[in-house]
């Protein structure tokens, strides 16, 4: 089974998007793949699913959170290398239909 790491950056109010984001990814993203979610946030994560790995990320004002996106993601490079695929999806993105690995990789 292919393995997919999916990154979410949600600090401050953007952490509120995590539950619906995660739910839509679980339902529609890469069926048949083992998924691990790398969640970068400054907030508290309580009762999170087992397939979420949290990373602390200080809240940065616009535009710095976007400008430093790749530096943020690189902090998880060792874990990302364990996966067959890696994908970053915006925190306010919701999947509404199935997305197969062959559609994006």
Enumerate the language-model features and the residues they cover.
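N-terminal anchoring/stem segment of glycosyltransferases
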Residues: 1-65, 78-82
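Generic preference for flexible, low-structure residues
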Residues: 22, 41, 70, 102-105
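Glycine-rich, basic loop-to-helix element that forms the pyrophosphate-binding segment
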Residues: 65-72
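GT-A fold catalytic core of metal-dependent nucleotide-sugar glycosyltransferases
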Residues: 73-105
């Amino acid at each position: 089974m292919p393995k997919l790491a999916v990154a979410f950056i949600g600090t401050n109010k953007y952490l509120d998007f995590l539950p619906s984001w995660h739910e839509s990814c679980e339902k529609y993203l890469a069926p048949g793949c083992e998924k691990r979610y790398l969640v970068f946030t400054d907030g508290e994560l309580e009762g999170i699913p087992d397939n979420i790995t949290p990373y602390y990320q200080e809240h940065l004002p616009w535009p710095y959170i976007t400008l430093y996106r790749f530096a943020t993601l690189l902090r998880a490079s060792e874990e990302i290398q364990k996966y067959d695929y890696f994908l970053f999806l915006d925190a306010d993105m919701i999947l509404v239909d199935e997305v197969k690995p062959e559609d994006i990789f």
